[in-house]
UniProtKB/Swiss-Prot annotation:
GO terms for cellular component: bacterial-type flagellum basal body. It is found in: Bacterial flagellum basal body. This is Flagellar hook-basal body complex protein FliE. The lineage of its organism: Bacteria, Pseudomonadati, Spirochaetota, Spirochaetia, Spirochaetales. The gene is fliE. PANTHER family: FLAGELLAR HOOK-BASAL BODY COMPLEX PROTEIN FLIE, PTHR34653. One of its GO terms (molecular function) is cytoskeletal motor activity.
Length: 111
């Protein structure tokens, strides 16, 4: 059975990747220099995800501007696909942040 182990240090939860097929932290990151047992904090993964969502939003702006200024240089479906990807990325990130906030509130309310 393959597991992803976690251990706690001060205020950080560190995750250890046990299998390269599971919990790929480079899924949203353009940097592929991670090794199999690299330790990434939740904060690092979240910040990388936010950065990638921002890049997808900026890509939509660029593609839309290109479609307006040079309509023959880009297909309409490429614009729609870029918008859909950015919307999906933002929706997923929003859901993760909301769940994280709810989990934090639940932990705080435990007495």
């Amino acid at each position: 059975m393959v597991r992803t182990d976690a251990f706690f240090t001060e205020n950080n939860i560190n995750l250890v990747k046990k299998n390269p097929l599971h919990f790929d932290v480079n899924l949203f990151s353009s940097k592929s220099n991670a090794k199999d047992n690299d330790i990434k904090t939740f904060k690092d993964v979240l910040i990388n995800s936010i950065t990638d969502v921002n890049k997808s939003q900026l890509n939509v702006s660029k593609v839309t501007e290109q479609a307006i200024l040079k309509p023959s240089s880009i297909d309409v479906h490429d614009v729609v696909i870029a918008m859909s990807k950015a919307n999906m990325n933002l929706s997923i990130l929003k859901a993760v942040v909301e769940r994280g906030v709810k989990a934090y509130q639940d932990i705080i309310n435990i007495r």
